[in-house]
Amino acid sequence: MDLKNKKILVTGGNGFLGKNVVRNLENLGVSDIIIPSSSDCDLRNMGNCKKVVDGIDVVFHLAAHVGGIGLNREKPGELFFDNLMMGTQLLHESKMANVKKFIALGTVCSYPKFTQVPFSEDDIWNGYPEETNAPYGLAKKMLLVQSKAYREQYDFHSIVVIPTNLYGPDDNFDPSSSHVIPALILKISNAKKNNLDQIEVWGDGSPTRDFLFV
């Protein structure tokens, strides 16, 4: 699909990944890019979802309520509800508005807690996610189910991209919600500034993770 003359919606376009997606779209010559702000367009509201996809050709759904271990432990209900509502309503209203392509961002947190390492793409249905991440991971996982169902019944063109853990410039360094790499960078930076000889790192060091630089 040639994107140059398409009207493109990027939810979460002001976020860490979204800024990079918008920059790349601009480099491809796309000029009509809509980036709604969460304060003006709450995607948990179905009416807002309906309005924001009106006249749109392609949707990149990158908006999410997301954070690190601390946030997942503190607000599992919010993470489940917010991400489920945003995703399922936006996809549905995109279908209703005859959007030509819907690209959603999934999460590696949807994969089972117990699986072989390295795991394959097909392993996503082979078990329950790690309990701390399960509300967020399962809410995102439902986009896979909905995408397949809408493709089969309505021939709606949607895909769910599941990257590994992301990091890079413009990442979230808020200690209450950041992921492991920015959290460690901040802890080490603060320790150096305050002449501390140690930092607190969660876990026992045994988990294996992979990361993707954005």
Task: Annotate each PLM feature.
Residues 135, 139-142:
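Active-site helix of classical SDR
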Residues 88-133, 159:
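Conserved Rossmann-fold NAD(P)-dependent oxidoreductase catalytic core, especially the SDR/UDP-sugar
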Residues 4-5, 99:
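Phosphate-coordination loops involved in phosphoryl transfer and adenosine-cofactor binding
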Residues 46-83, 93-96:
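NAD(P)H-binding glycine-rich loop region in Rossmannoid oxidoreductase-like domains
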Residues 31-49:
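Adenosine-cofactor binding site in Rossmann-like domains, unifying the SAM/SAH pocket
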Residues 11, 36, 59-65, 102-108, ...:
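SDR active-site strand-loop-helix element
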Residues 6-26:
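N-terminal Rossmann NAD(P)H-binding glycine-rich loop of SDR-like oxidoreductase domains
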Residues 114-123, 145-214:
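NAD(P)-dependent short-chain dehydrogenase/reductase
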